[in-house]
Amino acid sequence: MSGACREVVTLQLGHYSNFIGTHWWNLQDAGLVYDADVPAGELQSDVLFREGLTLAGHVTYTPRLIAIDLKGSLQTLRKEGSLYDTENENSAFTWDGQIMTHQESPPSKNSFLQELDNLDTGGVLAESDFNHLTSSVDNCSVPGASVAVETINSSLERIQKSYRLEGSVRVWSDFLRLHLHPRTISVINQYNHDGESERLEVFGQGEALLQGQVLEDLEDRLHFFIEECDYLQGFQVLCDLTDGFSGLGSKVTEYLQDSYGGRGILTWGVAPVNHPDTSSMKDLYHMMNCALGTLQMANHSSLFCPLTLRGGLCRRPPPPTAFPLLNCDPLLWYHSSSVLALALDALTVSYRMRHCSATMWQLSDALTTSGRKVVSAYGSVPFPMMLGGCLPDALDAFSNAVPWRSLSACPEISDRRFCFSQSVTLKGVDEQSLVSRLLPGMEAPSPLHYERSGEDVLSAYVRSHYPSSPLAVQLVSSGSKVTPPFPQIFSPSLSAQGFLQSHSTPASPSCPPVSCLPVLTSLQSSPAVGLQLSELQRACASLDLRRVAPSFLTHGPEHAEISEYLEQLRNLAHCYRQSHSRSSSEEDDDD
């Protein structure tokens, strides 16, 4: 049974969080179907979206979202959005003297935003922007997923045009494809997004922000979205981990825990591979912010998970995570955030399903036993499966290797066959392809081909690698729709549906781009998390901040408090130890 819709409020804190969030909301928006005759999908969009009315009586469907960023971060996007006309409101004017008006030219919009505006006002794109209107777009394995009426969604889905926004994306609003509610965007004017002065760089600055007007503004926005919820299940928080937003996120999650106890708080601490205009001192700041933010947000959340393509969270990390079927530039935020958004789309499936969903607190309770509130994410983006193939064949192709790579900067461990618990999700493989198509009398290539359901196939495969771990499995046949403005970062060996082809297809105007992807993810509590936390704690504890970075202490916490926090981080890392997984270096830490 589907049961009642359990709503979620999303908070995005920081610029990179909003990069990931923008891609993630674009993916959700692309999956919406506006035809009432089409059967309801597997994912319940009302969990994330809210229905409303404009002053003119028009029905709106917008994210239940609070997005916080700094002054100068919006560019062409109005803070109040464009659903409600606020420019024509009359203002009382009492000055009788001479008035001089200075008009500043607005920032220019890229080609995607210009054409989106044209569609939004009822315009039609040029005929050259379309390529075989009805034949080139696949419906990502969802029966009847075509849109019967012309909408912005259906128009964007049919556009066979590569915008190549890599050179024009400066901020996250440069590729935002959906409308936001006027209560969504909150700008912190005390700090600048760009420039050399008034930057939000250290943990203590962020901690000190959540008071006065900033706190009142957050409370008002939360009350607005929460009061209209019938069955609020909790909050999903995306928070920048490497700058001062880690301190703000610590205070925001603490406020949510104190004010809405019993609701789930799933926090994703996000970090880009690189930062513009970085330096050795800023790299030190980034590492300290990661350590303090991880500890504090884990303390105040039901579950905390780092989400990044970085190879590690310390100052000199290994190379970033790469996926063989993606031509992704990890240094480009527009690219790296799109990969993380695809993974997040699958990682959050369990509490968004229409039927047999697990609530946020059920997911967190299963993964965070014995005080292990930090978990790690892994993904196969996209999941490599042959066009026309089956899931058992795709999994067998990995042989003894696991099919995913780290999305949490976790180190490799010698014994990968153990984890405390995990939740695995596969999106984008239709029901007919989940099991083997063996004819009677045929010998099965592997035990997976004997399984009779997709859940059994995936469970059997995962248990072969993690034989003693509690496991939850979710399957969703609809893939992630990567229509414009998602970057075309995909290997030419992928079909339009995101599956492997026997022969690579060179890019050409006659070949439709990839419009849908299968994705496999795993959310794990494992000893690898303990190794990561230990490495981060040791690197931070080895620094004498009073000597090498006294400016980090200017806004707090004090040096003694930081020492106490690092000791708590060390104790948290110890929670992930098992006698059979200890290394000699870890044993030394016990002394």
From Swiss-Prot:
SUPFAM superfamilies: Tubulin nucleotide-binding domain-like. Keywords: Cytoplasm, Membrane, Mitochondrion, Mitochondrion outer membrane. It is found in: Mitochondrion outer membrane; Cytoplasm. It comes from the Eukaryota. GO terms for biological process: mitochondrion organization. One of its GO terms (cellular component) is mitochondrial outer membrane. Signal peptide: none annotated. It holds the Pfam family Tubulin_3. Its main location: mitochondrion. InterPro entries: DML1/Misato (IPR049942), DML1/Misato_tubulin (IPR029209), Misato_II_tubulin-like (IPR019605), Tubulin/FtsZ_GTPase_sf (IPR036525). Involved in the regulation of mitochondrial distribution and morphology. Required for mitochondrial fusion and mitochondrial network formation. Belongs to the misato family. This is Protein misato homolog 1. It comes from Danio rerio. The lineage of its organism: Eukaryota, Metazoa, Chordata, Craniata, Vertebrata. The gene is msto1.
